[in-house]
Amino acid sequence: MKIYVVAYLAKNLGDDLFINILTTRYPEHKFYAISKGEKGYDTKNFKVYSNVYMFKALKKFQWEKHLANHYDAVVTIGGSMFMERGDTNRDFSLGKNKRYVLGINFGPYKTQEYYNNIHNMLSNVEDVCFRDKYSYNLFKDLPNVRQAADIVFSMDMSNIKNTNRKRAIISIISPKDKINKKYKKQYEEKMLELISFLIVKGYEICLMSFCKIEHDEEEIEEIYSKIPENQKKKVEKYYYNGNIEEALNTIADSQLVVGGRFHANIIGLCLGKSILPVLYSDKTLHVLQDMQIDTPIIDIRNLESFDIKSITDDDLTRHYDVEKQKEDAQRHFEKLDLQLKKT
């Protein structure tokens, strides 16, 4: 079958994992998508038409739904795919074919109108599977709505080389891109304090970018430039460039993951690492609450209330059993499996 994919194609590690999981699960089917211009996604069964002008025209004039009618099914796969951003009156439908909306959370949103638009759209698709109970509870009146653990938990990481190196992977985000530039100074100060704190405890540090387009790399350079010279020898940088296996092996070569990116925390958990989440929105919090994970949380929106020195050695070495989540995450695909006749 030919499947049209709606996803965030921007060389973002978390979203690239979604695509990898989807296309690997159904190797006998062909997947197609259109990106704003990002290249390097094509595989045996995934073709991306990379054209910024075509992408903008499809979105602006709502031609995408007509294009989608030429495919056997439509799969929307991602995390934060439905955020209001002021677009309260869009037509969210996408053609007449069966549409599957997988792995998402809802929000943030501000108006009832936006919620109603999404509620109406989701009521007309074949299957919706949220990754958190908060989002599910907003739409649970719909018979086609389900909830399962984040899709990345379903990924086979058996080929990844896991170590116990005393190293902390710190996933850095750009506050001005992800939340608000007013938090930038405080965020950088807190990350510098955390880096020093971990180095004193004997950790090596790797500052990791998940997405260049969202300015992770720029923020890393700014933070790195402010690290004292006597500490820089303990700090390295890793910039994700589309090589998923390399990125996962980088994270696996550690004991601790400081997760600014949502999926830094999920990958850390999958690989059996201790995690220290850094929040810029509630989406990570909702998932951690669903999993009943008890760990210190650094909230960028409330940095002044978090004391780095309150982090204990137990916090830095706590591990979590996520076998249940790894199995549960497979359920995102149970309806699509039927459509694509996977047994």
Predicted feature residues:
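Active-site anion-handling motifs in enzyme catalytic cores
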Residues: 1-343
